[in-house]
Amino acid sequence: MKNYFDIKDKVAVVTGASSGLGWQIAQAYASQGAKLALFARREERLQENVAEIEKEFGTEVMYAVCDVGDYDSITAAVAKVMDAYGRIDILVNAAGMGNNKPVMDQSNDEWERHIHIDLSGVYYMCKAVGEIMIEQNYGKIINIGSIHSRVIFPGGGISAYSSAKGGVMNLTKNLAVEWAPYNITVNAIGPAVFETELTVDSIELPGFMDLIKAYCPAGRLGKPGELDGIAIYLASDASIFCTGQLICIDGGWTAI
């Protein structure tokens, strides 16, 4: 029987792979035998993660220092992957930043920086890798969105974040339509709040966990590994007819 979830030997580029959700997804792909290219800005952390994947999973892995807000940095990193592997089958856009401030406490520069990294960075990565996928007539793009592109966080203070993620969702839909003729699927995963380096400051705020328990039917944060299944599904041929979707992994948050 065919294994529809097989991604063994597929080449996967994962941004934000030095920590957080990007690193978790990279490990999930390594466990399935994918060939990995880890992108992030922190070279020392990338080197540590490459060594850990080689030791734990024995799969092929490389890294490239990459700033997703800099298109020249992206094209150089993508060229490095093509030199090593000759193709890119999967792209996961997990790089991002956090900013929990009410509008009146947020500078215009902070707003623009957030939109630049969380939205423009995804656009730049999709454009650079999409060119390769169009030429090879195949590709799987997975953008890390958020449930807060669909529902507003009850505590407020995430206008830049949720606006950027709303843009990511609309970009996902547009690319899904444009690139469907090339056998490229483009989808987004919409996590609720997960335990990562990006969210630790928010989690420690007074009353934060009370909000989580009030609005998330599961009554808790997402845990490491709980995005692995959906990330593998969207990277595999099991999802060949699924494109332009936001799939929320949120403990039931968006069900109410």
Q: What spans do the regions from the language model cover?
A:
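Conserved glycine-rich cofactor-binding loop
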Residues: V11, S18-G20
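Conserved glycine-rich Rossmann-like NAD(P)H-binding loop of the short-chain dehydrogenase/reductase
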Residues: A34-E48
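Alpha-helical segment proximal to the catalytic Tyr-Lys
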Residues: E131, V177-E178, I240
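Active-site helix of classical SDR
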Residues: C126, A164, T172
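Short, small/polar-rich loop/turn modules that mediate ligand/substrate recognition or access, typified
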Residues: A180, T185, C242-G244
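Substrate-binding pocket helix/loop in short-chain dehydrogenase/reductase
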Residues: P102-V103, S107-I115, I141, I212
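Residue(s) in the substrate-gating loop at a strand-loop-helix junction
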Residues: S146
